[in-house]
Amino acid sequence: MTEEVNPKAFPLADAQLTAKIMNLLQQALNYNQLRKGANEATKTLNRGLADIVVLAGDAEPIEILLHLPLLCEDKNVPYVFVRSKQALGRACGVSRPIVACSVTTNEGSQLKSQITSIQQEIERLLV
């Protein structure tokens, strides 16, 4: 029943980066800096609020979220794919699978250093 990661899902986070991202998502949820779902992620990007966009590589069909990488590149926001939509949903504090989410900007947030370090790691994946 496990769905394979689509080859269009690039850049794909490795296990270590995925763990850091999931940890950040759980903390962002506590600080009210997490928007869940492809539509919410699109809204935060359009409003210029998104810091990082996380996408599920096993979304079916993958085309439902392939507009997000284009929008991220347009707005200069780092994005990354993780392997499992189920794990993404759990990290976001929801019992259902989630195909996309975004961590939003907040001035004076304690998460700023963590967000910056993950942004740099995502940018290293693209090189």
From Swiss-Prot:
Keywords: mRNA processing, mRNA splicing, Nucleus, Ribonucleoprotein, RNA-binding, Spliceosome
Record's subcellular location: Nucleus, Nucleolus
Top-level taxon of origin: Eukaryota
GO molecular function annotation: RNA binding
One matching Pfam family: Ribosomal_L7Ae
PANTHER family per record: RIBOSOMAL PROTEIN L7AE FAMILY MEMBER
Role according to the record: Binds to the 5'-stem-loop of U4 snRNA and may play a role in the late stage of spliceosome assembly. The protein undergoes a conformational change upon RNA-binding.
UniProt record similarity statement: Belongs to the eukaryotic ribosomal protein eL8 family.
Listed name of the protein: NHP2-like protein 1 homolog
Originating gene: hoip
